């Protein structure tokens, strides 16, 4: 019987390009992947920092909510489960649905990349969909379409670009763990910057400016990714035979997978709390925090940047 590890190693070698030397002795492709992911996370968290505030203060107000195509159907579906909701409660429910679905779609994005497309093409499509979604958020009528594009875009982008980081290294390369630390640092910096820029523009200048900044960030991320394609793992065609072999796990690997699956409820519970930073916390903070800073009315979204900065330190 064909050895699964041999097949996987052979496939990895066949999808690898000469990487050159980037920073700290890592392949040059890592720089492009980290920068692309950083800009994607900037766009993602920029939009997310504004979503509940935008819904509460603008879109769900009586003079605007009727302009959002299809939202009446969504509202009826939500209130059929929860009962009648206030504006703030409905905004929280919409955010919760989005935040829950956005963590499920990467599973489908990985399947699409492995079965039909390849990681490079799937990441590219995801970035384009996310950029379109951010720009469409600027218009009331296209709110639900924008959310749908963002969900699909994140699903295509997020997991697949992280997988490409691993593809830059052999399985036993000691630099691999450090590469993911650098990758996470890029994400952390984006989480700090996004509310400061998109949040400030959205709250102080206009909602469409904040969402537009998120869209521009995603376009920069896409351009960065495409500029670095020559340094990334080569994108071979989808290979069904290798995909079949990849499912033949050893007993030890199956135990590891089961252990990871068992951890999912715990991780999910922690995310419920973490996501409240972008949901109830913002609404509560806006009402209860003293946001004056040296005579300047500080945007409430800056609280998210402060929290992210403290987490990094």
What are these regions (language model features)?
Residues 1-29, 171-172, 181, 198-299, ...:
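Intracellular loop-helix junctions on the cytosolic face of multi-pass helical membrane proteins
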Residues 32, 90-91, 172-182, 186:
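Cytoplasmic loop-to-transmembrane helix junctions
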Residues 125-145:
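C-terminal ends and interior cores of transmembrane alpha-helices
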Residues 92-111, 305-313:
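Central cavity-lining transmembrane alpha-helices of secondary-active solute carriers
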């Amino acid at each position: 019987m064909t050895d699964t590890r041999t097949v996987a190693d052979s496939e990895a070698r066949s999808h690898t390009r000469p990487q050159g030397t980037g920073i700290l002795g890592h392949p040059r492709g890592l720089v492009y992947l980290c920068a692309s992911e950083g800009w994607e996370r900037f766009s993602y968290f920029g939009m997310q920092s504004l979503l509940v505030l935008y819904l509460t203060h603008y879109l769900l107000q009586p003079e605007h909510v009727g302009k959002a195509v299809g939202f009446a159907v969504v509202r009826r579906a939500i209130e059929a489960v929860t009962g009648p909701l206030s504006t703030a409660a409905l905004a929280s429910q919409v955010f919760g649905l989005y935040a829950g679905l956005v963590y499920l779609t990467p599973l489908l994005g990985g399947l699409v990349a492995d079965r039909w497309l390849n990681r490079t093409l799937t990441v590219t499509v995801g970035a384009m969909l996310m950029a379109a979604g951010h720009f469409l958020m600027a218009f009331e009528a296209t709110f639900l379409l924008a959310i749908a594009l963002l969900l699909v875009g994140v699903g295509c982008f997020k997991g697949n670009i992280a997988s490409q980081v691993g593809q830059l290294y052999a399985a036993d390369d000691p630099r691999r763990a450090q590469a993911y630390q650098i990758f996470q640092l890029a994400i952390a910096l984006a989480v700090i910057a996004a509310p400061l820029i998109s949040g400030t523009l959205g709250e102080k200048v206009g909602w469409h400016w904040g969402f537009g900044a998120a869209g521009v960030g995603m376009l920069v991320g896409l351009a960065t990714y495409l500029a670095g394609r020559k340094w990334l793992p080569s994108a071979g065609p989808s290979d069904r035979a290798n995909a079949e072999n990849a499912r033949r796990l050893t007993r030890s690997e199956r135990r590891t997978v089961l252990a990871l699956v068992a951890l999912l409820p715990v991780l999910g519970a922690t995310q419920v709390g973490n996501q409240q930073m972008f949901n109830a916390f913002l609404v509560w903070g806006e009402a209860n925090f003293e946001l004056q800073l040296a005579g300047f009315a500080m945007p409430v979204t800056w609280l998210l940047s402060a929290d992210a900065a403290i987490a990094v330190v």
